[in-house]
Amino acid sequence: MRHLALLSLLVTASAYAADAPNAAREKAWKADIFPMLENSCAGCHGKDPAKKAKGGYNIMTLESAAKGGKENGDGITWGNAAKSTLYKFSELGATNRDDEMAMPPKKAKSEPLTKDQLAKLKAFIEAK
């Protein structure tokens, strides 16, 4: 019986520990990351629920942003900004607007992320 109680405690503690980083990520997403992406990305990627998000990529929630769109892989690859399409395409938008994968596209009315914003996004993705 003691083993069962100990096992139950370990499972509960493990579940809590696994949720703690997710809760911290969600809080950071809502407070810091989404507000800076909203101006550059949300117009095409989910702000208007009546319109389909371009490329099937919706950034309105952390879960949907991490999942990615119909193409190009995961939006966020935790621990690796270089493999995260959200970061890669945003970086292209800030450094090479002529690249066809740059986000926002050159013809868009929205401004790309700044270098400081890119650094915040990179740190967010790479945080453990």
Question: What feature does the model see in each segment?
Answer:
Residues M1-L4:
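Positively charged n-region of N-terminal signal peptides that target proteins for export
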Residues S8-A18:
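Hydrophobic h-region of N-terminal signal peptides that target proteins for export
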Residues Y16-K128:
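Aromatic- and Gly/Pro-enriched helix-to-coil junctions and flexible linker segments
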